[in-house]
Amino acid sequence: MTEPEVSVPAVMRNYHEVLRNDLAKLLTPLAEAGDVAAFDAAWADYRVAIAVHAAMEDGVTGAGGGSAAMLDHYFDGAAGAAMFKAEHVEEHAVQQAVTDALPLGAAALCAAFMAYRAFAEAHLLHEEDIMMPLVARLPVPRAPLFAQWCVSAGIATGDFEHFVAHGVRSLANFGSAKNTPEGATRVFVHALKTVCTPTQWAQYLPVARSAATPGIWASVVAEVPSLEPVPAAH
């Protein structure tokens, strides 16, 4: 069968949908309900995931330089990597205010989180407005570029398996703004496989598989059979 065309940039862009799901569909209901314990656990998961994603944008010393630097490299500084690094510093401060509010009670936590959500969602839009038109102009093939500049940085954080599991679980449960859970999961996982080496994919495949519901995973593999290894003939 002919598999759908892979969208390599989805390994980065679709994670914005994961973060939006976290903010709007997971964390906001918990904050509004005053369920501090459940919020604390979900917030801890979110913080690890967004830290890996930010590293894939900003780069990690000794590993990939990040997506913003990649776009600056190919388009004469047009992405503004330094500007986005500065935004990430500010984002981290607003994020820390939420963590600091956890022991202060439900009302303080909700207020801090809503301020953070507004900042974070505006930041995601700003990145998309600047970066996506540039991504569309990158030379092909793009998979080696994203592997070198972004994925290597994510792996260097030591939390890339969390990034994969968190992303797949979110998309499998909530989908994305423009796609069903099945479609959103497929697009992200297909991109992830494409930017991984075979050895890396052998490591991350079981993580992705276990993070999706069985029905979602079956639907994804039905469309992209190459995600799963072909059993050896006996």
Q: Which residues does each predicted region cover?
A:
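Small-residue-biased structural context
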Residues: 1-234
